[in-house]
Amino acid sequence: FLVVHLRMTGQFKLLEKDVLACTHTRVRFFEENGRELRFIDIRNFGQMWHVPYSKSVSEIVSGIKRLGPEPFSADFNSHYLKEYLKTKTRSIKSALLDQETVAGVGNIYADESLFDAGINPKIKSKHLNKTDLNKLCNSLTKILRISIGEGGTTFSDFRDLEGINGNYGGQAWV
């Protein structure tokens, strides 16, 4: 099977036959009926891995073993954060951006979540108490749910599969 990391600008487009490929088309998959699935990536940051059925994803995809829990998983909670961050001297914003702390959180959602939770992004991670971390977990999942519902955040060239901009940016506080 195929594992894909879109990174910041990667996207898939399903097109009818006879549509010319744009200059940022990186991979093309052809269907028997002539339609085509294209991986398009303006910045060329996206990655693809072929994972044979005889292997695990973590054997092939570099770095996947180091990823922290997903924000919507049961493993991501204030207890986990308290234990993970108890010795960390870096700022909480820096910790949120580290994919080993929590997977998939980028700059916009770290800022929004910290603002929503009322936490100064510069505070050292180890100084946050359980109440702060509970607020942060709740804020992060809340902000991500809202953003997903709005189609994400478009700040330059992000589009969904229909070519539509994400609308979360208009609601952002930061």
Across the structure, where does each feature detected by a protein language model lie?
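Structured catalytic/nucleic-acid-binding cores of DNA maintenance enzymes
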Residues: 1-174
